[in-house]
C-alpha cells in the first residue's frame, strides 16, 4: 500500500490499490495531507487516517473492503491526537469483504461491512458522501474506551468529539451486521444494522457532535447529538492554493 508517516503538506492522488491485508492508503502521524481521487478495493481497510491532523479525504472510491474509510487513534505512538479530518464526496460502497488482517493488528478488529469508522477522532467532518451497501453500518462513531489499549494510554483522549455528519446519501446499509453489531441490533429487537451508529463510552464524555437531516437515516445513539448549523471553514480547507489540480475546496 501507500504508507506515509510523519509527512507534511502531502498529496496522495490517482492510485488504484487492492488486496492488501492492512490499509491500502495509510496516513500516519502526518499533517496537511490530501487523499484524492483514488480507488481502493478488496483490502482490509481502504483508507486509514491514524493519529494525523488536517487531512482531506475527497473524491475516492472505497468499495469491497472490510472497512471503507477509517479515522483512528492508535495508542502508544509519538503523536497522541487525530483531529480536523474532512471526509467528503467519496463513494463508500459494499465494504463487506471478510477481515483477513494479521491477527492482533488494530485493523483485525474492524467488522466486515463497515463503511466509515471514526474511533477517538476529533473534529471530523463526514459530508456529501454516497454510502451504500455496507452490511454492518454506513457510519460508525465510537470511543476508544471500547479498545483496551486506547483506553489505557493516558496521553490519548479516547473520545470522539465534535464529529459532524452532513448531507450524505445513504441507503441499503446494515443488511447483515457482523459480530457485536449483530448482537446490539438484536438487543434492540432488530436484525438490521444502521446507516449511522454512535457508541457512547460508559462515562458519556463525548462532546459537541452534530448531524444534519437526521430524519433521513436509520440511526442509533444520536440522542445527545445536536442538529448541525451551517458549515464553517475548517483548517484542512485552508491547505489548498489556487494552483491545486482543478479542484476548489
What are these model-derived regions, one by one?
Residues 1, 47, 73-78, 113-115, ...:
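Short, recurring structural edge motifs at helix starts
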Residues 1-5, 21-29, 44-51, 66-73, ...:
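Short glycine/acidic-rich loop motifs that flank beta-strands on beta-rich extracellular proteins
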Residues 8-23, 31-45, 53-67, 81-96, ...:
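Right-handed parallel beta-helix
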Residues 54, 75-78, 122-123, 138, ...:
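Short, catalytically relevant binding-site loops at active-site mouths
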Residues 105-106, 198:
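N-terminal secretory signal peptides
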Residues 114, 120-121:
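Loop/turn-rich, solvent-exposed surfaces of beta-rich toroidal or solenoidal domains
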Residues 147, 151-249:
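Acidic, glycine- and Ser/Thr-rich low-complexity intrinsically disordered tracts
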